């Protein structure tokens, strides 16, 4: 970023971030198309969105109770309400989708996709309550991609609260180191199959790690143009190519292989 962008970074869009997100959106489409490079794309594409969000975090949101409250209200309106509304629509239309064949309750016709059957009023209400409290996992099939909105909302709110508390202490850096370590431990445990009862919250830890990496890039004014130069891109491509032959990552399922693997893939 040039000097003008650094000076006004809080008041203007960051071109590099927009470009990076645009590229990752394209890669996301390619990855979901059954491309030969899907495993390579999955190593980093979702983590990058959380890194970008962390990079755009503004400390002013955590400077007072009023600012924290305003920030939470903003995220409720922009993330939580849309998430609940979209999922609610698909929940209420569940039986209609089964009837017209968009959803299938016949294994021979499912094509390997999750079977979904008709649900009654009670189950509809249960699923709606689960959605409201983020306890439904990715049950609502057509709204499955909204796991990202749910996860981003939780990470944003969690970080704002933690940042506010950290500002009130004298050992701020120590707190952030502990938070990072705790997230690494929890993300690793979730990846190993623990804490499945967390449902919609189990993606939080891996996502928060990527979010914190974005904050560090912003804090130390890492020049994105230099980091993602032709040479940097070459190194990242090779590292990720090697990693893709070993394993892949799925943040939506909390699968990160191991923490070192995940952090390196995210940074690359």
What would you call each of these model-derived segments?
Residues 56-66, 189-193, 215-223, 243-248:
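Juxtamembrane membrane-interface segments at transmembrane alpha-helix termini
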Residues 1-185, 195-196, 207:
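Membrane-cytosol interface segments of multi-pass membrane proteins
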Residues 39-43, 196-204, 253-260:
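Non-cytosolic membrane-interface motifs at loop->transmembrane helix junctions
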Residues 48-56, 206-216, 263-267:
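Alpha-helical transmembrane segments and their membrane-interface exit regions
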Residues 223-268:
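Alpha-helical transmembrane segments and terminal signal-anchor/GPI-anchor hydrophobic tails
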């Amino acid at each position: 970023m040039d000097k003008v962008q650094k000076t006004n970074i809080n008041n203007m869009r960051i071109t590099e971030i927009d470009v990076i997100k645009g590229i990752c959106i394209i890669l996301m489409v390619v990855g979901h198309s059954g491309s030969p490079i899907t495993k390579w794309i999955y190593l980093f594409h979702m983590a990058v969105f959380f890194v970008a969000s962390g990079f755009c975090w503004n400390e002013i949101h955590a400077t007072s109770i009023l600012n924290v409250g305003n920030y939470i209200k903003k995220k409720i309106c922009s993330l939580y309400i849309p998430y609940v509304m979209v999922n609610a629509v698909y929940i209420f239309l569940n039986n209609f989708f089964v009837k017209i064949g968009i959803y299938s309750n016949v294994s021979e016709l499912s094509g390997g996709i999750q079977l979904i059957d008709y649900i009654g009023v009670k189950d509809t209400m249960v699923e709606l309550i689960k959605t409201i409290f983020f306890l439904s996992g990715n049950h609502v099939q057509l709204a499955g991609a909204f796991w990202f909105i749910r996860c981003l909302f939780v990470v944003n709110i969690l970080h704002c609260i933690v940042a506010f508390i950290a500002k009130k202490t004298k050992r701020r850096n120590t707190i952030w180191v502990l938070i990072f370590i705790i997230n690494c431990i929890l993300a690793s445990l979730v990846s190993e199959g623990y804490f499945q009862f967390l449902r919609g919250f189990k993606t939080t830890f891996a996502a928060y790690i990527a979010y914190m990496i974005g904050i560090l890039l912003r804090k130390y004014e890492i020049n994105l143009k230099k980091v993602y130069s032709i040479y940097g891109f070459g190194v990242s491509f090779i590292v990720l190519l090697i990693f893709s032959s070993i394993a892949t990552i799925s943040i939506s399922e909390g699968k990160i292989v191991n923490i070192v693997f995940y952090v390196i893939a995210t940074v690359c």
